[in-house]
């Protein structure tokens, strides 16, 4: 994809003619970018919830959401309005401060993860040089919020759910980080944009998926465990813990947990696209050369906008294809026991991730 003209500069030239200073424009641009990102992410989550309900209904030979809008497309929005209008109940004997701060501490780190996700070359809120490790760092705060929510509820089921969430996150955060480190070694960068650009030469043939198949499998399993999806939803197992750390929550606080889980799932799928599936680049080898030639025949402004739109669409299509696999996994596999979950993380995934990192390091040293 090409970007001959920066859209931010074009907007600044327009605002400059109206008498706005550079500093004021930068402030407005940051606020505008954050609002657009939050709106887009919220719409993406609503679509994800609708897709999961429809796919699960098809698997179980049901109809699923049908009456709230065409094909039930606004069912998730209706559920959000319902939760907003519900009463907010606080346990009488619980720790009010921990109970209230827990959902916020779970939701904010997930939103911060979207800062380093590039939907296209110029469509990224913060292009940090340590982008992928920034995501791992902020996501490691989430189990602390879950533990606070479980402890503050003064409920044995909630507390056990919080303990399980913390143990599960620690067990699978390390294999996940080692898989990301292997990708960073291949790309010689921790920046998400640089990692995508390193996969841009030969279409799908240059994807890290082919160079890191073991790391991809480890990343896929660990990301499902981090999102607490079946078969790894031990912290909220209904048959054992009622609803886990969410047992005592209602209203908007419960909605925060619900929203955070789907936001986290969408983040994981986007990072799979960025790390292993080439990001916003075309998957057909050498097809991007033809597209560049076609855009050069058009005006610079139009080609810039079209390139950005196509890049965003490609990123989202790849991400939702991975989400489809995650949804099918949830409604296909049974839940495992807590001892099996910990054994899988510490005795299986961690040694494999370490071995994969050792092989990647040896390969990179051999090429020097």
Swiss-Prot record:
Catalytic activity: a plastoquinone + NADH + (n+1) H(+)(in) = a plastoquinol + NAD(+) + n H(+)(out); a plastoquinone + NADPH + (n+1) H(+)(in) = a plastoquinol + NADP(+) + n H(+)(out)
Enzyme class: translocase
InterPro entries documented for this protein: NADH_UbQ_OxRdtase_su1/FPO (IPR001694), NADH_UbQ_OxRdtase_su1_CS (IPR018086)
Localisation per UniProt entry: Plastid, Chloroplast thylakoid membrane
GO cellular component, as recorded: chloroplast thylakoid membrane
Lipid bilayer topology: Multi-pass membrane protein
Any GO molecular function: oxidoreductase activity, acting on NAD(P)H, quinone or similar compound as acceptor
UniProt record similarity statement: Belongs to the complex I subunit 1 family.
Subunit structure as annotated in this protein's UniProt entry: NDH is composed of at least 16 different subunits, 5 of which are encoded in the nucleus.
PANTHER family recorded: NADH DEHYDROGENASE SUBUNIT 1, NADH-UBIQUINONE OXIDOREDUCTASE CHAIN 1
NCBIfam families: PRK06076.1-2 (NF004741), PRK06076.1-5 (NF004744)
Record-given protein name: NAD(P)H-quinone oxidoreductase subunit 1, chloroplastic
Organism: Marchantia polymorpha (Common liverwort)
Underlying gene: ndhA
